[in-house]
Amino acid sequence: MRRVITIFIVLVINLVLQSTVLQYIRINSIIPNTALIIIISMSLLRGRVEGSVTGFGAGILQDIFFGSSLGYYALLGTLVGYFAGRFNHNYYRENYALPVFLCFIGAVIYESVVFVTGAFFNGYLNYIYFLINIILPEAVYTAIAAVIIYRILFSVNDRIEKSEKHKRRLFSIK
């Protein structure tokens, strides 16, 4: 229960920061996708299920506050969490290369899907322009921010795991 509450608090703080403070560190009107970083980080640290749930939670918050339709970002976040969680067992947690790389690739795919679905409904199809001027710069910015945010989430996860391990030891029958 502690883990769920902690992740919910992290997602709410992210929502507030993304809509306030991060607006002041824009570069050419681009901000890092911190929700995506949280989803991928939690997926790598905890696996597919918790990554999917985190993705759904982050996405539903984005849908409620920023989206035009309920469920779109929730579905995207869930899928990102699931696929990033598949790498959970295949890497050394203290190595930042995989989270940064997945955040870069994830941002490119995520924003491409957002563009393609938006283009489908709006009829705007200049993908190359969008890729060069928005998707790739945002992916780079997201990857850079991932170094800091992953470290924070890593230590939060580590504290929760130690607390859970301690509780299991207290209540185990010998």
Features from the language model and the residues they span:
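Terminal, non-globular segments
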Residues: 1-174
